[in-house]
Amino acid sequence: MPPAGGPRAPRPAALPRSLSRLRECPGRSRIVLALGATQMALGCLIVAVSFAALALTTSARVRHSCPFWAGFSVLLSGLIGVVSWKRPLSLVITFFMLLSAVCVMLNLAGSILSCQNAQLVNSLEGCQLIKFDSVEVCVCCELQHQSSGCSNLGETLKLNPLQENCNAVRLTLKDLLFSVCALNVLSTIVCALATAMCCMQMVSSDVLQMFLPQRSHPANPTCVTPHGTVLHQTLDFDEFIPPLPPPPYYPPEYTCTPSTEAQRGLHLDFAPSPFGTLYDVAINSPGLLYPAELPPPYEAVVGQPPASQVTSIGQQVAESSSGDPNTSAGFSTPVPADSTSLLVSEGTATPGSSPSPDGPVGAPAPSEPALPPGHVSPEDPGMGSQVQPGPGRVSRSTSDPTLCTSSMAGDASSHRPSCSQDLEAGLSEAVPGSASMSRSATAACRAQLSPAGDPDTWKTDQRPTPEPFPATSKERPRSLVDSKAYADARVLVAKFLEHSHCALPTEAQHMVGAMRLAVTNEERLEEEAVFGADVLDQV
């Protein structure tokens, strides 16, 4: 129980103001309890006296007019009043008020009937004990002055002879009926008071709330409902304004704004690929998009070393500085000397270059084949990459798909013509029937991308007309190992093209479209390559 000076419990918000005031005022609650208990006592007395009067007489008039039904209604009303004191609910209070009003009318009728019967019994003074078939009955009637007998024309009253004196029974019945009349009158008064009190309490609170201003009560802060809660808010859906959505949890990854693209690397989230497992390279790394080393050639896999090899055709373009996360490096690829094809160099946008199978990146080989006269160097002379002339046409192994990517930092203009010159040189040197490039290698070199640009330029020509390809050899991987590396490299190129949303020049867009077409055409011949490689391995 809280102390006298402590804060009181807050009023239930769901109850009306009248009910809350009833709980706050202990005097009114005690009055309701007293009225309910009085009604219960009066009801019990009315019922008991009425049944006692019924037991003394067998007359139909008295029995039919005995108000025991008024006693039951008052008893029920008093019970509801006690419940309303214990639980001051709106429904219980209203029901108590209505039932008290009904009891007022019933008690008025009962009091009138009981008083009339009492006067009747009082007027029948002459009582005689009469036996009917061994049954004794007291018959009371009006006394005639001329005779001592009862008149058949007047009213008669039959009483049960509980004792020898019939006059004593009549007097007892008269007293009981007068008692019932008095109890009904008292019950009428109590029920009227209960009805008036409940009605005044409910109506006065509504009238005061309607006409009088709201008074400020210096209530305890703990008892006051804080403003802004659901109890003080009325939701108006017409004026409801939805709250602002929260900011995105992750910034956009593939925006190609020139100011921001040069400051950060290209972060691509690739799905787990067997290519990374095969060559121990984390494909999902934000700084390393693909391995810095191409798959080994078929001759090295089967144990047939070529006569001479060409190594390190692309050297490291620029060393990574402390503040620049992107660097450019070249691939080091062994190339057989007896091949008859164009040698293509490419760059990669990885944080570094892995050493080649024959030596470190950038170290020239003892003997490097020379390019034909008139061939343009695929790399800018200022970038530090050179290609030395060699005998005839040389080519990579057919299992090595050539990839050509862009550097994500630095001057984009120095890299754009590089792949274009390389592609033009390859097309001019390739002749029908030679194994200069596979379709995927040629298309990959066409896909050299610019690191910055407007994304709308990329969307201008989504389906360019592919340029005619020179007739190339349709050699396929001749082993399951080469087939696996070939398929993984092709998937990696396709994913890189799929995530490239930066702007490209017009000629580069045509190259990318041709590369997409070449990658699509290679899918049909994959099953044939696997089957042929399996046959060669069995032989």
UniProtKB/Swiss-Prot annotation:
Biased segments, Polar residues type: 306-331, 395-408
Topology relative to the membrane: Multi-pass membrane protein
Signal peptide: none
Keywords, ordered alphabetically: Membrane, Transmembrane, Transmembrane helix
Subcellular location per the Swiss-Prot or TrEMBL entry: Membrane
Transmembrane segments: 31-51, 65-85, 89-109, 176-196
Statement: the UniProt record of this protein carries the keyword Acyltransferase: no
Keyword Membrane attributed: yes
Region (Disordered): 301-481
Family matches, as InterPro entries: CD20-like, ENTREP1-3
UniProt GO cellular component terms: membrane
One Pfam family of this chain: CD20
Residue ranges, compositional bias (Low complexity): 347-365
Sequence similarity: Belongs to the ENTREP family.
Entry protein name: Protein ENTREP2
Organism field: Homo sapiens
